[in-house]
Amino acid sequence: TFWGTEIPWVSISDMPISGYVTNTRESISKLALKSKKIDISPKGTLLMSFKLSIGKVAILDIPATHNEAIISIFPYANKENIIRDYLMIFLPLISTLGDSKDAIKGKTLNSTSISELLIPISNHEEMKRIISKVDLLFQKVSQLFE
């Protein structure tokens, strides 16, 4: 059967707001993995929803597969994950600028509109500064709700 207990399967509801996916409500079987030619995304992969709740992002903290409303993003890798973390900040902001289409259950982006998104990129030091500043602001916001 498709469903099982072996391989975590991420749906949009498993993605915390700008956080890490540490577990999933559902899993698929190894048979499903083979028969459907589904890939397992490694731990550390940036995920983004492009259907229904466009632009929701999270980072995998476990190897997992995901449903068809989510894409795995593998930016140029560096040890500090600067580009991945930078994209995690900007993708929710700019993904709504893509050419979305109305579908039965809501808006969707297609692969062309995703690939045509213009992402403001600067040098690594500037991106690190932006990431640090945004992280600090999120910490302050979290403290307001404690």
Per-segment meaning from a language model:
Residues D14, L91, I131-D135:
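Generic short alpha-helical hydrophobic face used as a protein-protein interaction/packing hotspot
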Residues M48-S49:
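A generic structural signal for residues embedded in beta-strands
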Residues T1-A32:
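DNA target-recognition patches
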Residues S53-K56:
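Short, charged beta-turn/beta-strand-edge "cap" motif at the junction between a beta-strand
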Residues W3-E6, I40-G44:
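Short, well-ordered loop/turn elements at secondary-structure boundaries
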Residues M15-E26, K37-K43, I59-P120, K140:
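Basic, amphipathic alpha-helical recognition segments used for DNA target recognition
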Residues E116, N123-E146:
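Amphipathic alpha-helical segments with low aromatic content
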